[in-house]
Amino acid sequence: MASTQPKNDAKSTEPKPEQPVTEKKTAVLEEDDEFEDFPVDDWEAEDTEAAKGNNEAKHLWEESWDDDDTSDDFSAQLKEELKKVEAAKKR
């Protein structure tokens, strides 16, 4: 059973000391700042993809970066919903 008396929370009645706002400034990079380069990987010829490919050109990535596949169910459902919305607007 819940108590009808409000709780006396000591934390809520004490005034909070005001904390000074300190603004941290980030270091600004200048044009002449030097950056550490990555080490050069020295690959052995037999460790490369060309050595394993039997002189066959292997596609390591897709020729087309177009991810728009309009034949999936979601695209078809979306097109139907758009048609319904357009029809409702014309009324």
UniProtKB/Swiss-Prot annotation:
Keywords: Proteasome. GO terms for biological process: double-strand break repair via homologous recombination; mRNA export from nucleus; proteasome assembly. This is Putative 26S proteasome complex subunit sem-1. Residues 8-28 have a biased composition (Basic and acidic residues). Residues 29-48, 63-72 have a biased composition (Acidic residues). InterPro entries: DSS1_SEM1. One of its GO terms (cellular component) is proteasome complex. The keyword Isomerase does not apply. Part of the 26S proteasome. Disulfide bonds: none annotated. Belongs to the DSS1/SEM1 family. PANTHER family: 26 PROTEASOME COMPLEX SUBUNIT DSS1, 26S PROTEASOME COMPLEX SUBUNIT SEM1. It comes from the Eukaryota.
